[in-house]
Amino acid sequence: MEFKTRFLQDPRQSFFLFGPRGTGKSTWMKNTLENAIYIDLLDAEVFRAYSSRPERLKEVAEAQKPGTTIVLDEIQKQPQLLDVVHQLMESHTGCRFILSGSSARKLKRSGVDLLAGRAAVKTMHPFMAAELGENFSLEEALGIGTVPLIVDSPNPKEAIKAYAALYLKEEVQMEGLVRNIGAFSRFLESISFSHGAALNISDVARDCQVERKTVEGYVSILEDLLLGFRIPVFSRRAKRRLSSHCKFYYFDSGVFRSLRPAGPIDAHQEMEGAALEGLVAQHLRAWNAYGNGLCKLFFWRTKSGNEVDFVIYGQDTFCAIEVKNTANIHAKMLRGLLTFREDYPEAQPCLLYRGKEHLKIKNVLCLPVEEFLKNLKPLNPLRGDMGSKPTYG
């Protein structure tokens, strides 16, 4: 299988690399880190060797030349190895360590402190459209997502169905993260209705027939496993009464679609709209993570109902983005952006839609969402990706 170049850059120091299962961490390391010593803790024999004698890592490290890179893949399987890594970094062996895993949750539960800040923390995300290049299809991304394990599968539709089951079995059930796997399965389905929407914990708890604090714990598990994320309301110098609820997203549009029930009474357009908004969200997160990581992602909603899907705020960035799953733009679709601009004239408003033309309506730039995603690359200023020769309307 041909290796697709990723935007993640090697920081040239010891670092943690986290990311959901199947996002390509191991593939990236094997193709990027030449001559590294690779220790795969998913391998049963390797696992047993380091489980019985963690000090084996010290023996391996001390036998290497200065500058050697040692990779510990799936470090959460053996968190006690972090103590050995810490000792080796303190003793200046000259080796650098790359510690990868699908979650930091078990490391935190084990009381480790991620090497007291001595190692950077990086995250691997699903493919960005620009990483896929000509192979990117918006329609496919909305259906199966962009997780490398799924995209590169011979049968992506079957692979995406099995993905949630894989996590339930290996990450949740085997690690004993929840007591009632049935309730957690219902929760995964229930919270899919909150994808791209305000997250009301009490409503989800009622739907799952569990206590509110149980759902709060479930949401934390999703976040720790990097399967979901919340974005807060943008409230800097607020001039209006704002919503207090965060918005929730699954980390990938295909994972969302696989968990969201679909039937005769479920609106296809509504699900596709939520998938499109989530696809933009996951791209914005990856753009920031692979770049300088200095921006923060918010949304904006007033008590009166005016809303902007995304607010990206950083030292040199202040953008407001609305996403519409339609090929035709109506003036009322701009209401949230125009209201936001009244309060924040410094912000650059942009509407992403399913059409083909570049438009400027009421001084709001309207861009084809597929083109926007394909042009979105780390370290490129977000406003640069919005530049175009618009048709005025």
Regions found by a protein language model. Give the residues of each.
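Pre-Walker A adenine-sensing motif
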Residues: 1-13
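Hydrophobic anchor at the beta1->P-loop junction of P-loop NTPases
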Residues: 17
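Conserved lysine of the Walker
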Residues: 25
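Hydrophobic positions on the alpha1 helix immediately C-terminal to the Walker A/P-loop
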Residues: 28
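Short glycine-rich substrate-engagement loop in P-loop NTPases that contacts/grips substrate
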Residues: 39-68
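Conserved catalytic/switch belt of AAA+ P-loop NTPases
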Residues: 82-105, 113
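Short regulatory helix/loop adjacent to the ATP-binding pocket of P-loop NTPases
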Residues: 105-120, 136
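Accessory nucleic acid-recognition modules appended to NTPase machines
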Residues: 158-318
